[in-house]
Amino acid sequence: MTERISLTRYLVEQQRVHGRIPPQLRLLVEVVARACKRISFAVNKGDLGDVMGTAGTENVQGEVQKKLDIIANEVLIEANEWGGHLAAMASEEMDGIYVVPNRFPQGEHLLMFDPLDGSSNIDVNVSIGTIFSVLHKHHDDPTTDEPVTEADFLQPGHQQVAAGYCIYGPQTTLVLTVGDGVAMFTLDREQGSFVLTRENIRIPEDTKEFAINMSNMRHWDAPVRRYIDECLQGKEGPRGKDFNMRWIASMVADVHRILMRGGIFMYPWDKREPNKPGKLRLMYEANPMGWLVEQAGGAATNGRQRILDIQPAQLHERVSVILGSKNEVDRVTSYHSGI
């Protein structure tokens, strides 16, 4: 019988053998995983748990909040504020940062999260998920005792120390990187623990699948239109092969599919809001997903620049996102460069 390795054991071995995970970071990841279990149970209850529908409020982006958005946000805050592993948190669902109250010890890390990505799919029972990203506080001066401010969160994605997501679908699956490849853990509901089910996940460099919202085609910039036009021409076109389109309208679900079998995900800038660089959030979605994809051998850009090299100017900054199989992402990027 194959030996079952729990998330806790995996993290301990990463800490002991590779020295990659200090104790506070290990605790943080375990607490986030426990919070995701609670969110999973709430999602699974659906109409039986009075968690469906809208909450009658809007988040900082002006989006109508679902009841589960608020529940998931509260679960993550309550689980992480008291353990001594965090200094502050930031969420897509909150205007500003949440500093750990003085009655609790403060830790060395900052946690950012999208508590429930794809929440527009909640009421139709499509896979949704939690995305998270971890940074060191006071990255430029770790010895300072200055209070944490919003500016401490404004670090480029390549300074992340852990990132991952938990997808709530037919299985509840946690996908994680600490900078040494990508590992996947599946929730064993009978045991109540996440168990390692895949390690060293790799994204194929080439693909025949793309994920994009085709209804917005008339609003895209020329390089994106060119790329999709060539895909649609199939074997008779310049690509010489047929492509399939996939679009779930849940980033966590689309990226999970790409990690499992390859593909390219695109949520590009469009002409309807020319002053905005994109739709997805750099800090809560693009950075953690971009790092996971890169750690699995893929690539992630905004069309012109590597996602992880973008210096954020604000907490809720938006960005155009193109990520997935490396050769396809490189092709789209070259079209933006006029190559």
UniProtKB/Swiss-Prot annotation:
Subcellular location: Cytoplasm
One example of a Gene Ontology biological process annotation: fructose 1,6-bisphosphate metabolic process
EC code: 3.1.3.11
Binding residue positions for substrate: D117, G118, S119, S120, N213, K279
Gene Ontology terms: cellular component: cytosol
Classification via CDD domains: FBPase
Enzyme class, spelled out: hydrolase
Keyword entries, A-Z: Carbohydrate metabolism, Cytoplasm, Hydrolase, Magnesium, Metal-binding
Keyword rRNA-binding: no
Pathway note: Carbohydrate biosynthesis; gluconeogenesis
Protein family according to the UniProt entry: Belongs to the FBPase class 1 family.
Protein name from the UniProt record: Fructose-1,6-bisphosphatase class 1
Origin species: Acidovorax sp. (strain JS42)
Lineage summary: Bacteria, Pseudomonadati, Pseudomonadota, Betaproteobacteria, Burkholderiales
